[in-house]
Amino acid sequence: MAEWLLSASWQRRAKAMTAAAGSAGRAAVPLLLCALLAPGGAYVLDDSDGLGREFDGIGAVSGGGATSRLLVNYPEPYRSQILDYLFKPNFGASLHILKVEIGGDGQTTDGTEPSHMHYALDENYFRGYEWWLMKEAKKRNPNITLIGLPWSFPGWLGKGFDWPYVNLQLTAYYVVTWIVGAKRYHDLDIDYIGIWNERSYNANYIKILRKMLNYQGLQRVKIIASDNLWESISASMLLDAELFKVVDVIGAHYPGTHSAKDAKLTGKKLWSSEDFSTLNSDMGAGCWGRILNQNYINGYMTSTIAWNLVASYYEQLPYGRCGLMTAQEPWSGHYVVESPVWVSAHTTQFTQPGWYYLKTVGHLEKGGSYVALTDGLGNLTIIIETMSHKHSKCIRPFLPYFNVSQQFATFVLKGSFSEIPELQVWYTKLGKTSERFLFKQLDSLWLLDSDGSFTLSLHEDELFTLTTLTTGRKGSYPLPPKSQPFPSTYKDDFNVDYPFFSEAPNFADQTGVFEYFTNIEDPGEHHFTLRQVLNQRPITWAADASNTISIIGDYNWTNLTIKCDVYIETPDTGGVFIAGRVNKGGILIRSARGIFFWIFANGSYRVTGDLAGWIIYALGRVEVTAKKWYTLTLTIKGHFTSGMLNDKSLWTDIPVNFPKNGWAAIGTHSFEFAQFDNFLVEATR
């Protein structure tokens, strides 16, 4: 057994770490200098034979869709605090990459994001919130990498087809205008552009996109393809020299830490360009910690990008709380810095794009993995994870069983790292509250007399970072306000002369796009309104409804009264609705149930139990035409509903048994222009 070295200083460190462990019961968090106390694996970290692949960074996706919707109207200082936890270097997640949806007006998981070109002759580079988010990220980290990717496309590009490749030049033009607009209007340099999220790629389109980028002087913008599976795009690149030349990065989604043979044969950069998508509990954190290491070890992926950045959408929408952190209550200011933020920090705070992986990375003998990266200037960062199968399952793909057990692991630094005198140590333990630590700095590890080796005692569900960098920090702010339900009384008159964002607070568009509108034809009460602005179905990514709809409020609302002024713009065929107890949204919006109160320009009304209009509770004639304002009131109490038009009762006490609760909503009968004003909801759970 090797002699104890620096025993006095080690004893002091052991006492400190035992105290830090507290009720965890571990007799000192497990750093043993050259103490081979038990059999275990030995792992050499060496750059003598060169380095591995270049590291491109860790990031997250905003969009795909509307995942940051509720973030924008958080009050200060909480909004800035959330952004700091995500983007500020050496503070929280400290992300290297921000990938955003190029809004295309379609439903793309949890809502729609507006296009910068709703129509062929329409250009507006201030819609939505992704521009704002990219600028906020750049404020905090000027070196952050920016990526744009379309999910859906505005309908005019399809010329009557649900397909973006009808006119390749036109679609390329549309995408390039977004990149040019980002620079012209926001001084944002987009670094990478994608093709069509998780849908078909077109090789000729990719080539045309490259030519158009070059023509616009955007040679620096690189192309990622195809944000889907490895196989097809990799095989196409191997068979098509021109396609091979224009694709810079092969990006795959949810690869399960493995890449395809053809992808590796290309020699191109390989990215997990969307991954994670898991509830941000400690299991989600375990998933994230495992794949951040093993995506490179198993699949040579040099970047991993989480969907999604921050869970800022109503939690009952699909994939609730599948963000690195949670910020879904702008009305209260409450947010939660979830454990995936600190798992991210183990890598992001101690590496940068442009560093290189060592060739000597791999799996631990008794489960877990290790990677090491260097900047080539003497700095070294080692990340070790021992995430158990039970606590590291991602939402997909299926994870084959593996075992992780307690072990001793000896690491030997060789090559240019053999003379490193000291390593900073950061530690995370996931699991029971009594044993849990998140990104805790331990005493540094001295290597002066150890021949560059050290031994760790590793248990399951742990994460270690050992690094020469001294800049790491666990940032913090005072606790945000306590969680509160959505206000039971909520009103909005939309009287905003110069709105900072194009969408009204808390409304979450699920099909169609609802924007602030200045009604120049009405200088009076309805001068400022909320308008549904799409008159054509977009090129869809999901199963958008046939009707447009925007939801708002508390999913647990049971008894409520909704009142809203409405204005149908389309004669004869136009129609609008208000609704309560809407029980579905996102990619499930077509099958939403609820109580929907419709009026139509043809002089009729209808009460339905679903958005599609198949379940009819009541219908009749009413004095309604287009181009005139009306006030609708819908009251739902217990098992009964009543409705009024301009304060005149249309029906009373119609029995409704399902659903029991849900959001409030507004919308239109089809993709048509319509306006809404003086929205009011009064509700109880």
UniProtKB/Swiss-Prot annotation:
Disease: Krabbe disease: An autosomal recessive disorder characterized by insufficient catabolism of several galactolipids that are important for normal myelin production. Four clinical forms are recognized. The infantile form accounts for 90% of cases. It manifests before six months of age with irritability, spasticity, arrest of motor and mental development, and bouts of temperature elevation without infection.
Binding site for substrate: T109, W151, N197, R396
Effect annotated for changing G59R: In KRB; infantile; significant reduction of activity
Catalytic residue positions: E198 (proton donor/acceptor), E274 (nucleophile)
UniProt-recorded name of the protein: Galactocerebrosidase
Covalent S-S links between cysteines: C287-C394
Biological process, per Gene Ontology: galactosylceramide catabolic process; glycosphingolipid catabolic process; myelination
Family note: Belongs to the glycosyl hydrolase 59 family.
Superkingdom in the source lineage: Eukaryota
Gene3D superfamilies linked to this entry: Aldolase class I, Exo-inulinase, domain 1, Glycosidases
Provenance organism: Homo sapiens (Human)
GO molecular function per UniProt: galactosylceramidase activity
Subcellular location: Lysosome
UniProt EC number: 3.2.1.46
Keywords from the named record: Disease variant, Disulfide bond, Glycoprotein, Glycosidase, Hydrolase, Leukodystrophy, Lipid degradation, Lipid metabolism, Lysosome, Signal, Sphingolipid metabolism
pH dependence: Optimum pH is 4.0-4.4.
Effect of G553R: In KRB; loss of activity
Tissue specificity field: Detected in urine. Detected in testis, brain and placenta (at protein level). Detected in kidney and liver.
Residues of this chain annotated as glycosylated in UniProt: N143, N379, N403, N556, N559, N602
Residues of the signal peptide: 1-42
Record InterPro entries: Aldolase_TIM (IPR013785), GH59_C (IPR049162), GH59_cat (IPR049161), Glyco_hydro_59 (IPR001286), Glyco_hydro_59_dom (IPR035394), Glycoside_hydrolase_SF (IPR017853)
Catalyzed reactions: a beta-D-galactosyl-(1<->1')-N-acylsphing-4-enine + H2O = an N-acylsphing-4-enine + D-galactose; beta-D-galactosyl-(1<->1)-sphing-4-enine + H2O = sphing-4-enine + D-galactose; a D-galactosylceramide + H2O = an N-acyl-sphingoid base + D-galactose
Cellular-component GO terms for this entry: lysosomal lumen; lysosome; membrane
